[in-house]
Design a protein with these regions (language model features):
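Bacterial N-terminal signal peptides that target proteins for export
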Residues: 1-6
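Sterically constrained small-residue positions within well-ordered secondary structures
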Residues: 11, 80, 90-92, 134-136, ...
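Short, compositionally biased low-complexity segments enriched in polar/charged residues
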Residues: 66-93
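Composition-driven detection of intrinsically disordered, low-complexity segments
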Residues: 7-9, 185
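Hydrophobic h-region of N-terminal signal peptides that target proteins for export
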Residues: 11-18
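Non-cytosolic coordination micro-motifs
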Residues: 21-68, 98-192
Length: 192
C-alpha cells in the first residue's frame, strides 16, 4: 500500500513539473494587442475612416489618403511621433489588412522605444545577417509581437540599410495572402 502511495505521489510530482515546464516555455499572451493604429481601426472600412487628401500642394492638417493603387493607400498628414515617417495602408476589401510605416534607419531606436512603450515587450526578437550589393554586412534586428488578431514586425533594415519599418497586419489577411499565393502556384503548376 505504501509503495502504491509513493508511486502515485512520484507520478503526480513528475506530471506537475512537466506541465509547469511546458507552460514556462510557451510565450506569454500579448496583453496590449491593438485594434487600431494612429487612430484608424483595423475592422472599419478604410475609405470611410480616412478622408481623401485635398488636391494641390497644401500639406494636410490631419491624416488623409491618396487615391489607391491595387488596394494600397499612401497617407499624408499623420500625427507627429517625434521623427519623420511614411505610412501606407493596404485595404483591398474594405477593412484594413495592414499598416506599413517606414522611417530612416537612424530612427530605429526611437521606433522600437515607441512600439515597446505602446505595445509592451515583443513576443520574439531575432537577428539576421544582411549583405549589401557593395559587399557590406550588417546585422538586421527584428522585433515581433503576435496576438490573436494582429501581428507586428519592426525591422531595423527593411528593403535597404537606410530604411527601418514597422508592419502591423491582421492574422486573417496574412492567412488569406498565403492562400492566394498557394492558389496561384497550384494554378501555374497545373499548366506545366
Amino acid at each position: 500500500m505504501k509503495a502504491k502511495l509513493a508511486f502515485f505521489l512520484l507520478a503526480s510530482c513528475i506530471a506537475v513539473s512537466a506541465q509547469a515546464a511546458k507552460k514556462s516555455s510557451e510565450p506569454a499572451p500579448w496583453m496590449q494587442e491593438p485594434d487600431s493604429f494612429m487612430g484608424i481601426q483595423f475592422d472599419q472600412k478604410f475609405v470611410y475612416s480616412v478622408p481623401e487628401c485635398p488636391a494641390g500642394y497644401e500639406i494636410p492638417k490631419e491624416i488623409c489618403r491618396r487615391a489607391p493603387y491595387q488596394g494600397l493607400y499612401i497617407t499624408m498628414g499623420g500625427p507627429s511621433i517625434g521623427f519623420g515617417y511614411g505610412l501606407s495602408v493596404m485595404a483591398k476589401n474594405g477593412p484594413v489588412d495592414s499598416f506599413y510605416l517606414t522611417t530612416p534607419s537612424e530612427n530605429y531606436l526611437h521606433l522600437t522605444q515607441l512600439f515597446i512603450t505602446k505595445y509592451g515587450s515583443p513576443t520574439s526578437r531575432s537577428t539576421e545577417s544582411v549583405k549589401t550589393k557593395g559587399g557590406g554586412a550588417f546585422t538586421n534586428e527584428i522585433l515581433a509581437w503576435k496576438g490573436k488578431k494582429i501581428e507586428i514586425v519592426v525591422e531595423k533594415y527593411t528593403s535597404d540599410i537606410n530604411t527601418s519599418s514597422a508592419t502591423l497586419r491582421t492574422i486573417a489577411s496574412k492567412a488569406k495572402a498565403i492562400q492566394d499565393v498557394d492558389q496561384k502556384i497550384n494554378g501555374a503548376a497545373s499548366k506545366l
